């Protein structure tokens, strides 16, 4: 293998560790953490990681980016994390993760509304196919799945999708890297979760060694390190390569649920998962023409899109999912 190809393969493998890590969130939540504490869990995942990234980046927001960071932090972290963990507490990991594959449809609709980007027929078809695959999974398991958990999973996906589209609309400040912008959002989101966690869930629960280990894993490996690897890769890989890695998160969740937790999936549900993942990947890795210089996306401050300085914006709004919507998207 040539040195350049070997370097690219190594970079891709390291970047892929981020969505793989995010796919373990559901199993860690249900097996290691105190039950029914979605706000507390979201707080301990977001705030320590955000403060760590702020210490590493040593850059604070300026001007309008104070309130923009709060808005993005609320959508990408403050609302997303609690809803994500609520769904993780109430749904099997594979089920909760696959709901996130409807995210491209949310992104398409919000991109048309906020960015004026008209989706192509291929984008709409693949988005509908992904949603149909999700419906096969959810409807086939209607008797076993918790309604509140399903609603929380959809709401978390919608929240992250809105955050991704606004991130694309605003770009990032001149001279600020993705690590700093991620730190701003994690810190803002964690600070927003903190008072809600106290008001709704009361005092923090007593933690045993198992829970402490779970929280350390979520804050450090699953969030701080995973986000660093993700945005480092986003800046060096093409958009197609980055978005192709996204389905690794729900796939990991489903595999971990089956292999380690004894969860089962019916043949129809497996077909739905395959359809959803396949449609999402097909919509993101299809051939795209290179955009002209006039199509470069910059925010109001003139900065490029998060995670890829100077990157040109594709006309297909599906491409913005390459910003890390699974992950963190979290599921990510």
Enumerate the language-model features and the residues they cover.
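Juxtamembrane helix-entry segments on the extracytoplasmic side of multipass membrane proteins
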Residues: 7-11, 34-39, 43, 62-67, ...
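Specific alpha-helical transmembrane segments that line the substrate/conduction pathway
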Residues: 40-51, 76, 81-118, 122-127, ...
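Hydrophobic transmembrane alpha-helices of multi-pass small-molecule transport proteins
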Residues: 53, 110, 119-139, 157-160, ...
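Specific transmembrane alpha-helical segments of multi-pass solute transporters/efflux pumps
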Residues: 21-29, 54-100, 108-110, 136, ...
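Cytoplasmic-side transmembrane-helix entry/capping segments in multi-pass membrane proteins
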Residues: 65-74, 119-130, 149-153, 175-185, ...
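Helix-helix packing/entry segments at the starts of transmembrane helices
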Residues: 42-44, 96-104, 166-190, 220-259
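Glycine-/small-residue-enriched transmembrane alpha-helix faces in small-molecule transporters
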Residues: 1-43, 132, 142-169, 191-192, ...
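Hydrophobic/aromatic residues within transmembrane alpha-helices
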Residues: 32, 41, 45, 87, ...
């Amino acid at each position: 293998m040539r040195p350049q190809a070997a370097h690219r393969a190594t970079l891709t493998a390291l970047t892929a560790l981020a969505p793989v890590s995010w796919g373990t969130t559901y199993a860690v939540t249900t097996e290691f953490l105190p039950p029914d504490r979605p706000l507390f869990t979201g707080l301990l995942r977001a705030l320590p990681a955000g403060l760590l990234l702020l210490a590493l980046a040593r850059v604070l927001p300026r001007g309008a980016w104070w309130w923009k960071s709060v808005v993005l932090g609320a959508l990408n972290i403050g609302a997303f994390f609690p809803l994500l963990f609520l769904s993780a507490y109430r749904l099997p990991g594979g089920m909760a993760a696959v709901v996130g594959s409807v995210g491209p449809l949310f992104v398409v609709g919000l991109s048309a509304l906020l960015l004026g980007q008209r989706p192509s027929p291929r984008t709409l078809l693949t988005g509908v196919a992904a949603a149909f695959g999700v419906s096969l999974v959810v409807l086939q398991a209607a008797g076993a799945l918790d309604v509140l958990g399903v609603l929380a999973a959809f709401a978390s996906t919608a929240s992250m999708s809105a955050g991704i589209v606004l991130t694309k609309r605003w770009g990032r400040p001149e001279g600020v890297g993705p690590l700093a912008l991620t730190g701003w959002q994690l810190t803002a989101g964690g600070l927003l979760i903190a008072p809600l966690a106290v008001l709704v869930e009361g005092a923090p629960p007593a933690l045993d060694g198992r829970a402490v280990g779970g929280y350390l894993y979520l804050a450090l490996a699953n969030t701080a390190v995973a986000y660093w690897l993700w945005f480092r890769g986003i800046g060096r890989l093409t958009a197609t390569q980055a978005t192709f890695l996204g389905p690794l998160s729900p796939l990991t969740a489903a595999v971990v649920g089956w292999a380690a937790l004894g969860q089962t999936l019916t043949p129809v549900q497996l077909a739905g998962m395959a359809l959803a993942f396949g449609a999402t990947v097909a919509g993101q890795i299809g051939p795209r023409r290179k955009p002209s210089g006039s199509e470069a996306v910059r925010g109001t401050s003139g900065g490029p899109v998060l995670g890829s300085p100077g990157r040109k914006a594709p006309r297909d709004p599906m491409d913005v999912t390459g910003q890390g919507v699974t992950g963190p998207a979290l599921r990510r």
